[in-house]
Amino acid sequence: MVQIEKVFGREIIDSRGNPAVEVDITLVGGYFGRAACPSGASTGTHEAIEKRDGDFRFFGKGVKKAVEAINTDIRKSLLGMDSTDQPAVDNQLISLDGTDNKGHLGANAILPVSMAVARAASQALQVPLYEHLADRTYLLPVPYMNILNGGAHANWQGADFQEYMIAPVGAPDFPEAVRWGCEVYHTLKAILKKRGLSTGVGDEGGFAPKVSSNRAPLDFITEAIEMAGYKPGKDISLALDPASSEFYSDGVYELKSEGKKLSSEEMTGYYEDMVAVYPIISIEDGLSEDDWNGWIAMTKAIGKKVQLVGDDIFVTNTKRISRGISEKAANAVLIKLNQIGTVTETISAVTMARNAGWSSMISHRSGETVDSFIADLTVSLGTGQIKTGAPCRGERVEKYNQLMRIHEELGSRATYAGKKREIRHL
């Protein structure tokens, strides 16, 4: 037992220049953990609540109230607790909040405390964070690199779809996967520049050019893969996150870049046509967060051809994931810690998905910090997939760099997921 001695929260800024919460945890013996909470741009309606001040500071986005809660109520409730008992700490935080959606204290107050405790405990136990949280063989994930941005991440200046990703499934190990991704990223930049398109980057480091259709980015990326010396589909596959809740209204999906208005069935057909032409292995949030019937039909139609990842529809919430499993809506879950609010609840979500034969993908948020917690979490849980942006911008590459450090530390004890990533439905 290593008791929590000090709890301290502060306001910092994230990768978009918005306030975020950072927490320091000190244990008896001087062991220390620090963690920061990210924030999303396209957030699901059913996510845990993020508390903002709503006053004149930072146009209402300040987090002083969340920090105050950490330094008063949360501090008092955690002092003296055993830091190595993560479920007990998290259950104490959940009980203190007393709501289903973290609406009292705010997920942005609770999560960084939960993460910082885990980090401090790993230091006290003198083991790496990924080992402290681990419950299985170590698996280094396939990095899903968002190298071209559209939708809300590019201020709606180009494609309707929010993220176009590459997945180096054919790489022999994680460092090589990162190298392949970087080479494709730089090649894509040269292609866009040659065509007179913008090479400015969006929130997650991907390029954000103005394009005339949702297929154009796939053509650019496929060309970049080939020009970099790799084979599309064999070495490097593609993945999409349309974030379709952002362009869904009154039962209609409006693709403004192409002047189309589609039903759920037509949207599914739209994806099916794409999968037939391009080496797409994963589609996240292909339909809206509350279009359950559409998700069920889409899973039945194309779920054996491609991974269908639920983000906004599940929001890392076991109640919603359980419904999805029962109704066969999707076949994979995106995992974002701040959607649910504690490390323990996050692990429960991954466990539920795994027990149902579903895969999981650990994810960053568009408003990030340099905290690399999710890198360790991905390895410890063996999800085999991580989504943390382009190989650009410090808050993105820190996760990749941490995973390369873990690869180095584990040596032969680790396996790169590659084409054997934890996807059991295919």
From Swiss-Prot:
Its main location: cytoplasm. Keywords: Cytoplasm, Glycolysis, Lyase, Magnesium, Metal-binding, Secreted. Mg(2+) binds at residues 241, 284, 311. The gene is eno1. PROSITE patterns: ENOLASE. One of its GO terms (cellular component) is extracellular region. The keyword Secreted applies. It comes from the Archaea. GO terms for molecular function: magnesium ion binding; phosphopyruvate hydratase activity. Its cofactor is Mg(2+). It catalyses: (2R)-2-phosphoglycerate = phosphoenolpyruvate + H2O. It is an enzyme of class 4 (lyase). Disulfide bonds: none annotated. It comes from Methanospirillum hungatei JF-1 (strain ATCC 27890 / DSM 864 / NBRC 100397 / JF-1). This is Enolase 1. GO terms for biological process: glycolytic process. (2R)-2-phosphoglycerate binds at residues 162, 336, 365-366, 387. SMART domains: Enolase_C, Enolase_N. Its EC number is 4.2.1.11. It is found in: Cytoplasm; Secreted; Cell surface. The active site is at 204 (proton donor), 336 (proton acceptor). Binds a second Mg(2+) ion via substrate during catalysis. Catalyzes the reversible conversion of 2-phosphoglycerate (2-PG) into phosphoenolpyruvate (PEP). It is essential for the degradation of carbohydrates via glycolysis. Pathway: Carbohydrate degradation; glycolysis; pyruvate from D-glyceraldehyde 3-phosphate: step 4/5. HAMAP family: Enolase (MF_00318).
